[in-house]
Swiss-Prot record:
S-adenosyl-L-methionine binds at residues 233, 257, 279, 324, 354, 359. Belongs to the class I-like SAM-binding methyltransferase superfamily. mRNA cap 0 methyltransferase family. Its EC number is 2.1.1.56. This is mRNA cap guanine-N(7) methyltransferase. Disulfide bonds: none annotated. It comes from the Eukaryota. GO terms for cellular component: cytosol; nucleus. One of its GO terms (molecular function) is mRNA 5'-cap (guanine-N7-)-methyltransferase activity. It comes from Scheffersomyces stipitis (strain ATCC 58785 / CBS 6054 / NBRC 10063 / NRRL Y-11545). The gene is ABD1. Residues 65-86, 101-112, 129-150 have a biased composition (Basic and acidic residues). Residues 18-165 are annotated as: Disordered. Residues 220-529 form the mRNA cap 0 methyltransferase domain. Residues 20-36 have a biased composition (Low complexity).
């Protein structure tokens, strides 16, 4: 039994040894194959992991041959321009610069681009170059077609909501656009023939207000004429707009058809206490308010002395309203937004209407409404001061038949700066009967683009002012006003304004075609009667 047992044990050991030997060979073969595969993989990955791995993101590397540009140099699809804060770029772990070439369309001179996500996309950057800004902004010559015509007001006009104005976007840099080539203003008013005068005028001046913010005023082709007209207004207002003597009450100035607030500086010159501006153009009123707000007076420390007011800023109070003063009363326009203003600030010392009264002469009712507004707003002795086209000038052009050729066969006069085109055949004697509704289209280069206006027969204006208790004090054309008043005002007006009226002969005033264009206007002053 012992012999059998020993034989069985030897047999079992032999079987185990053979099995162990077979397992060792298989293990060796397996180890050899795995080592070979690992070697191949390492050799492949040494050239490029991207060739065998699809789920690994592309990483810029100085040693890899990249077939696709990294995400941070790609030009993405444009996004909303207010989406300035893109996600942070992934930080590359590679050492050394990438050999990846930028696309030809990509700018290579922006040294900050590698730190900004989607650096090539202009609209995602907080601070953008002038060239990129200009590429995005509409050409001023195309502005009317691109945006203004997209917004319609209640009358079918193209009034722009405040939310679309540049003045409501404090990050908008107007100086950028103003550095470009100057483009003269041209309005874009659709269906003009079907609109009433209010809609046309409102739309025109809305567009004009937006356009002017994109231009440098001194580059205007009529800058000398603008300066001349401003000097005339300084002279008229300076001579006749006065504080009431012997009465302790604020010096108040009512600016009807105030536009963009172009006479705010003149009110500071007059040292008024309270300004009220009303205009039919909502965009112009918004611009006037912003102009006032930006220059509202601040007080400077004098280190122990009495505080001094900044002479370059406005130290009067002001309020602004949008409305048609030719069809509504002043209380109707002001009281809804400024309750109690009539009782607190009226009557006023001066009412001013500059280059606008002629629009009222469409109808007798409009003229009576505006003159009633003026008279009821003024204190006794207060002044009504304005500028209008001269009916005498128009009559002379008609009588002498001093007309220009017109493609439509209509009667037209003027020069390269301005033109007057009559809607109907004018009377041969130049006297319009009846005195209302005598329309012509007026154009002034870079200012008024073929807008309907109405002849203002001055004797009719005088008679209607007398009907509401106002007496004529002055009627004079611009050239005569300037020649008479410039010696007095030469030292009072700013050097910039004076130098802006310098003629080719070294003297000051208007010359050539500008002289005829400014000669189209007169200034007037009426005084409110009573005690």
């Amino acid at each position: 039994m012992s012999s059998n047992t020993d034989a069985e044990i030897q047999l079992l050991q032999s079987i185990k040894e053979k099995a162990a030997a077979a397992g060792t060979q298989n293990s060796a073969a397996s180890t050899s194959g795995s080592s070979s595969d690992s070697k191949i993989t390492r050799e492949s990955s040494a050239f490029s992991r991207r060739e065998i791995t699809n789920d690994v993101p592309i990483v810029s590397s100085a040693y890899s041959e990249v077939k696709e540009a990294p995400a941070w140099v790609k030009k993405d699809t444009p996004v909303d321009k207010y989406d300035k804060y893109g996600s942070r770029p992934a930080v590359s772990t590679s050492s050394g610069p990438s050999r990846v070439s930028r696309p030809e369309s990509e700018s290579t001179d922006n040294k900050y681009s590698k730190y900004i996500s989607r650096a090539a996309e202009p609209s995602t950057r907080v601070k953008r170059s002038r060239e990129e800004f200009e590429r995005e902004e509409p050409d001023p010559r195309e502005y009317g077609n691109s945006r203004i015509e997209q917004e319609k007001d209640d009358d079918g006009g193209a009034a722009i909501p405040y939310s679309n104005l540049d003045v409501s976007n404090q990050s908008y840099d107007h100086r950028t656009l103003q550095s470009r080539e100057y483009y003269t203003f041209q309005s874009h008013i659709s269906n003009k023939e079907e609109r009433d005068i209010n809609s046309i005028v409102r739309t025109h001046y809305n567009q004009r207000a937006v356009h002017s913010k994109r231009q440098v005023r001194k580059n205007s082709p009529i800058i000398k004429m603008r300066n001349f007209n401003n000097a005339i207004k300084y002279m008229l207002l300076g001579n006749y707009s006065k504080r009431e003597q012997g009465v302790d009450r604020p010096f108040t100035f009512l600016d009807l058809c105030c536009g963009k607030g172009g006479d705010l500086n003149k009110c500071q010159f007059l040292e008024i206490d309270q300004y009220i501006g009303i205009d039919i153009s909502d965009v112009s009123v918004k611009e006037a308010f912003q102009r006032y707000s930006q220059k509202k007076v601040r007080f400077r420390s004098a280190y122990g002395q009495k505080p001094r007011k900044d002479e370059l800023r406005y130290d009067f109070e002001a309020c602004f309203a949008t409305g048609d003063c030719f069809s509504k009363t002043i209380p109707e326009l002001l009281e809804p937004n400024f309750p109690g203003i009539i009782d607190k600030t009226f009557p006023v010392d001066t009412v001013s209407i500059q280059f606008s009264l002629h629009y009222a002469f469409e109808t007798e009712d409009k003229v009576r409404t505006i003159l009633t507004n003026v008279s009821r707003s003024l204190r006794p002795g207060g002044k009504f001061i304005g500028t209008i086209p001269s009916s005498d000038f128009i009559r002379k052009k008609i009588v002498t038949k001093n007309y220009l050729p017109d493609d439509r066969g209509k009667k037209k006069f003027g020069n390269s700066l301005y033109s007057v085109t009559f809607d109907k055949e004018p009377p041969e004697d130049g006297v319009f009967r009846p005195p209302f509704g005598n329309k012509y289209n007026y154009s002034l280069k870079d200012a008024i683009d073929d807008v309907p206006e109405y002849v203002v027969p001055f004797e009719t204006l005088r008679a209607m002012c007398e009907d509401v208790g106002m007496e004529l004090k002055l009627k004079k054309n611009f050239i005569d006003i300037f020649n008479q008043e410039i010696p007095k005002y030469f030292s009072k007006l700013s050097k910039h304004l004076i130098e802006g009226m310098k003629r080719s002969d070294g003297k000051y005033g208007a010359e050539g075609e500008e002289k005829e264009a400014v000669g189209f206007y007169i200034g007037f002053v009426f005084e409110k009667l009573g005690s």
